[in-house]
């Protein structure tokens, strides 16, 4: 008696190589259900191979350092330089050697629905994680660029392990640690991408909490960015303690110098 479609699907699920003899074996099965299962599994394997290749490319900078016997590599990234309200949040993440996390990418390229699952895997696998937070008052005092650097240095200081090298998205920090500045690093380095996810989820959760305190501004949806609803609330209710007075249109509203 031949195998049922359910049994064939179970066998296909175990295959990871398109050259496996089972694919040839099932090609001759004319049942529509078998052919659909074959097509689906082949598509999955191709997608998995493409993802493996992408993740391998995201270890390019890390592998260069591994070749120099440097393994404690901290990726650093920020979230929240552009919003009108809320803090700038940074993260530093040290991943184990050759760590691959499926779906890991620049947080802006990862569907929000997957942020928490990827964060959980980062937290499970990372050797160390540090987070830095600088509030709106400090941003107004020193400017967003300097505030971001302060937050990044905070994040590094909170790591439980001392990194041997820093991979940073487009910045250089005043720290006695070797560094590599990488443009668009959050999409090119696994370590920086991990930091971007940690920083993004941390900041989003903070903005949800601020939304409970200031419900009129829709912070849980706009994360402090200047959406139409947020700008309308500013006009109607004025600014809050978490608004950045050095950012327009708030700067003009309060005559910030």
UniProtKB/Swiss-Prot annotation:
Catalytic reaction annotation: Endonucleolytic cleavage to 5'-phosphomonoester
- Gene Ontology terms: cellular component: cytoplasm; ribonuclease H2 complex
A molecular function (GO) term:
manganese ion binding
Arranged from A to Z, the UniProt key words for this protein are: Cytoplasm, Endonuclease, Hydrolase, Manganese, Metal-binding, Nuclease
Start and end residues of each RNase H type-2 domain: 71-257
Manner of cofactor binding, per the entry note: Manganese or magnesium. Binds 1 divalent metal ion per monomer in the absence of substrate. May bind a second metal ion after substrate binding.
Q: Where does a divalent metal cation bind?
A: 77-78, 169
One biological process GO term for this chain?
mismatch repair
Q: Cite the EC number.
A: 3.1.26.4
What does the UniProt entry say about where the protein is found? Cytoplasm
Q: Which cofactor does it need?
A: Mn(2+); Mg(2+)
Q: Does the keyword Hydrolase apply?
A: yes
PANTHER family the UniProt entry points to: RIBONUCLEASE H2 SUBUNIT A, RIBONUCLEASE HII
Q: Which HAMAP family match?
A: RNase_HII_B
Family that this chain belongs to: Belongs to the RNase HII family.
Q: What does this protein do?
A: Endonuclease that specifically degrades the RNA of RNA-DNA hybrids.
Task: Report the protein name in the record.
Answer: Ribonuclease HII
Q: Which gene encodes it?
A: rnhB
């Amino acid at each position: 008696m031949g195998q049922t479609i359910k049994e064939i699907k179970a066998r296909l699920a175990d295959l990871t190589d398109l050259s496996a003899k089972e694919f040839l074996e099932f090609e001759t099965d004319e049942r529509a259900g078998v052919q659909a299962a074959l097509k689906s599994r082949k598509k999955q394997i191709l997608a998995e191979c493409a993802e493996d290749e992408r993740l391998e490319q995201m270890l390019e900078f890390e592998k260069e350092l591994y070749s120099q016997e440097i393994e404690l590599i901290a990726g650093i990234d920020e979230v929240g330089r552009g919003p009108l309200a809320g803090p700038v949040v940074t993260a530093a993440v040290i991943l184990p050697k050759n760590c691959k996390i499926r779906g890991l990418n620049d947080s802006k390229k990862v569907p929000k629905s997957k942020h928490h699952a990827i964060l959980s895997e980062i937290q499970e696998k990372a050797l160390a994680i540090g987070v830095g937070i600088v509030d709106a008052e400090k941003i107004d005092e020193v400017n967003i660029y300097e505030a971001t650097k302060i937050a990044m240095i905070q994040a590094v200081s909170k790591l439980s392990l001392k990194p041997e090298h820093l991979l940073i998205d487009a910045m250089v920090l005043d720290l006695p640690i070797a560094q590599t500045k990488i443009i668009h690093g959050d999409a090119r380095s696994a370590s920086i991408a991990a930091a971007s996810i940690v920083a993004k989820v941390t900041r989003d959760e903070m903005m949800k909490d601020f939304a409970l305190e200031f419900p009129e501004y829709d912070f849980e949806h706009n994360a402090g960015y200047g959406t139409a609803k947020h700008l309308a609330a500013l006009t109607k209710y004025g600014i809050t303690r978490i608004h950045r007075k050095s950012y327009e249109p708030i700067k003009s509203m309060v005559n910030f110098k």
